[in-house]
């Protein structure tokens, strides 16, 4: 390995940056383009903010759905119906 000039900043070291820009392509060649491409494309690791998923909006007939819920029979109490034994 060649010695690197200590006066150079780390991002200017030879081989630290690829000669071509990164692309959005996911082919094998582009996945191994540079370390960043390998981590994000090949391994699928990204530390960016996750987009929030929008909730599904209630339909216009939500009132009829609520009405049908009230017509359902009430659930039976669980446990021993006679009460606790001593």
Curated annotation (Swiss-Prot):
GO terms, biological process: DNA-templated transcription; negative regulation of peptidyl-threonine phosphorylation; positive regulation of transcription elongation by RNA polymerase II; positive regulation of viral transcription; symbiont-mediated evasion of host immune response; symbiont-mediated perturbation of host chromatin organization; symbiont-mediated suppression of host antigen processing and presentation; symbiont-mediated suppression of host innate immune response
Where does the record place Basic residues bias? 48-59
User: Coordinates of motif Cell attachment site in the sequence?
Assistant: 78-80
Which residues does this entry mark as bearing N6-acetyllysine? 28, 50-51
Motif Nuclear localization signal, RNA-binding (TAR), and protein transduction covers 49-57
Sites of Asymmetric dimethylarginine modification: 52-53
The region called Interaction with the host capping enzyme RNGTT is annotated at 49-86
Q: Does the keyword ATP-binding apply?
A: no
Positions with a binding annotation for Zn(2+) 2 = 25, 27, 30
* GO molecular-function terms, A-Z: actinin binding; cyclin binding; histone acetyltransferase binding; metal ion binding; molecular sequestering activity; nucleosome binding; protein domain specific binding; protein serine/threonine phosphatase inhibitor activity
Q: Where is this region: Disordered?
A: 48-86
A Pfam family that the UniProt record links to this protein: Tat
GO CC term, one of those recorded: host cell nucleus
Please report the PTM annotation for this entry: Asymmetrical arginine methylation by host PRMT6 seems to diminish the transactivation capacity of Tat and affects the interaction with host CCNT1. Acetylation by EP300, CREBBP, GCN5L2/GCN5 and PCAF regulates the transactivation activity of Tat. EP300-mediated acetylation of Lys-50 promotes dissociation of Tat from the TAR RNA through the competitive binding to PCAF's bromodomain. In addition, the non-acetylated Tat's N-terminus can also interact with PCAF. PCAF-mediated acetylation of Lys-28 enhances Tat's binding to CCNT1. Lys-50 is deacetylated by SIRT1.
| Residues bound to Zn(2+) 1 | 22, 33-34, 37
Q: What does the UniProt keyword field contain?
A: Acetylation, Activator, AIDS, Apoptosis, Host cytoplasm, Host nucleus, Host-virus interaction, Inhibition of host innate immune response by virus, Inhibition of host interferon signaling pathway by virus, Interferon antiviral system evasion, Isopeptide bond, Metal-binding, Methylation, Modulation of host chromatin by virus, Modulation of host PP1 activity by virus, Phosphoprotein, RNA-binding, Secreted, Transcription, Transcription regulation, Ubl conjugation, Viral immunoevasion, Zinc
* Comment field on protein domains: The cell attachment site mediates the interaction with ITGAV/ITGB3 and ITGA5/ITGB1 integrins, leading to vascular cell migration and invasion. This interaction also provides endothelial cells with the adhesion signal they require to grow in response to mitogens. The Cys-rich region may bind 2 zinc ions. This region is involved in binding to KAT5.
The record's section on HAMAP family has: HIV_TAT
Q: Hey, which family's this protein in?
A: Belongs to the lentiviruses Tat family.
> Tell me, how does this one assemble?
Interacts with host CCNT1. Associates with the P-TEFb complex composed at least of Tat, P-TEFb (CDK9 and CCNT1), TAR RNA, RNA Pol II. Recruits the HATs CREBBP, TAF1/TFIID, EP300, PCAF and GCN5L2. Interacts with host KAT5/Tip60; this interaction targets the latter to degradation. Interacts with the host deacetylase SIRT1. Interacts with host capping enzyme RNGTT; this interaction stimulates RNGTT. Binds to host KDR, and to the host integrins ITGAV/ITGB3 and ITGA5/ITGB1. Interacts with host KPNB1/importin beta-1 without previous binding to KPNA1/importin alpha-1. Interacts with EIF2AK2.
Full protein name: Protein Tat
Q: Which organism is it from?
A: Human immunodeficiency virus type 1 group M subtype B (isolate HXB2)
Primary gene name: tat
